[in-house]
């Protein structure tokens, strides 16, 4: 990833993304902190889809927008598990767009059928509880210790709580459809 000074707005938040062989993949814009006039929440935006026309591969421009708390004087901004999960979800959409390689922009990135559009982002969410992934960056900001495996397991267990009950409610609400 190479930083790009595309405009003052994204001076430190625009990145030209290259494949391992050095070929240009996309422009990624990031906007991580709240400011006056910015709506709340998190989202991915595709400013320019990918497409191929007359042998020329037009690469996408995408953004990931979050509203992480800004760091304060002498203290880092720490992310909650929910914020990490949301970031991974939106980054999954961005990856879907950046890795697109199709003839028609209408089938590129998140412009796919609705039954598939969430798949890459939901796959990315799984990294939030992968010890190997977390150990690369998720450390206590004062001691440098990694997140204990027991805590990661508690998060996984909590996310699976009542799953069978919820599934049974779906079956009860529409038994013939979910048989």
Language model features with spans:
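Surface-exposed helix-capping loop/turn segments at secondary-structure junctions
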Residues: 3-7, 97-106
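Acidic/histidine-rich catalytic neighborhood
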Residues: 18, 23-24, 30, 100-169, ...
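Active-site recognition of the HExxH zinc-binding catalytic motif
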Residues: 82-97, 121, 176
């Amino acid at each position: 990833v190479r930083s790009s000074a595309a405009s003052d707005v994204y001076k430190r938040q625009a990145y030209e993304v290259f494949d391992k062989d050095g070929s240009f993949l996309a422009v990624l814009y990031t906007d991580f902190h709240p400011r006056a006039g910015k709506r709340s929440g998190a989202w991915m935006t595709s400013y320019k889809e990918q497409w191929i026309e007359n042998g020329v591969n037009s690469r996408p421009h995408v953004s990931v927008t979050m509203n992480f708390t800004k760091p304060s004087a002498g203290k880092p901004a720490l992310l909650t598990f929910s914020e990490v999960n949301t970031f991974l979800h939106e980054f999954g959409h961005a990856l879907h767009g950046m890795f697109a390689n199709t003839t028609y922009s209408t089938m590129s990135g998140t412009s796919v059928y609705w039954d598939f559009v969430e798949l890459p982002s939901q796959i990315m969410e799984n990294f939030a509880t992968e010890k190997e992934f977390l150990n690369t960056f998720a450390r206590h900001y004062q001691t440098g210790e990694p997140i204990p495996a027991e805590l990661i397991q508690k998060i996984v267990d909590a996310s699976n709580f009542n799953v069978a009950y919820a599934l049974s409610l779906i079956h009860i609400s529409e038994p013939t459809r979910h048989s």
